[in-house]
Amino acid sequence: MLFLIPSGVRLAWGKPVGPPEVAWKAMTAQQKRTYMKAAVTPTMKPIFQAFDPKKFKTFNCVTCHGRDGADRKFKMPSNDIHPLPNTPAAFEAKLKSEPTWPKWTEFMSQKVEPAMGKLLDLPVFDPRKPVEGAFGCANCHKLEAAAP
């Protein structure tokens, strides 16, 4: 059973159109917006709030897409999420030198990446077995420029 709601997004059995029925890349901007509000935000908000209730007391589009998200048509990676080192060696160095990095890395790799991979119907990035199109750090974070 299909319904047409005012926003123009088709619903099947009351569920917004989205992965895996329609690939994220094939969705219209309106379908993506509806899916983000109906599926992604309600799934990710409690995950982030369980990790740090104070930091993520407010969880909305700006949390991940940044203050300029609307101006950028919500394209990722975000300008407001800190960039990550662009090599495994540089990342390992940060893990050793930055006290909060191990807990954030564990949270992102164990909670955020798997949840987003499932929501977008994408494999999760595994550095031991890279797969093209996998969901990983660079989907949300910019990578630092390579050192000269």
Task: List PLM regions with ranges.
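Sequence context surrounding c-type heme c attachment/ligation sites in exported
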Residues: 11-148
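Cleavable N-terminal signal peptides
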Residues: 1, 9-12
